[in-house]
Amino acid sequence: MPTIQQLVRLRRIQITKKTKSPALVNCPQRRGVCTRVYTTTPKKPNSAIRKVARVRLTSGFEVTAYIPGEGHNLQEHSVVLIRGGRVKDLPGVRYHIVRGALDSGGVKDRTQRRSKYGVKKPKS
């Protein structure tokens, strides 16, 4: 336990938490423009072709974002909404594109977990 005089001389240090999504700059989502849309392969034990996009954000950062769901309509110059959330088997991919927002369409023929993929309730 420090004395009051020691605290006057050298105050207690605040523990700063390092953010996992620095490009969002304390916002829940950010808008950006796709500069490149391409596919990549995951790390070792997994095997797939994952769809990703390089996005220039309004905060000035250029990040790699994952495109979730089956099929997409994104191309270069598409305006997209980015949220945090990494993809465990893709190194360097720390953001997700929000489906159904701005230029990104919802996933076709999706009936379950629709809210996560930007799909309206089907007419029954």
Swiss-Prot record:
GO terms for biological process: translation. Residues 113-124 have a biased composition (Basic residues). Keywords: Chloroplast, Plastid, Ribonucleoprotein, Ribosomal protein, RNA-binding, rRNA-binding. Pfam families: Ribosom_S12_S23. GO terms for molecular function: rRNA binding; structural constituent of ribosome. Belongs to the universal ribosomal protein uS12 family. This is Small ribosomal subunit protein uS12c. The gene is rps12.
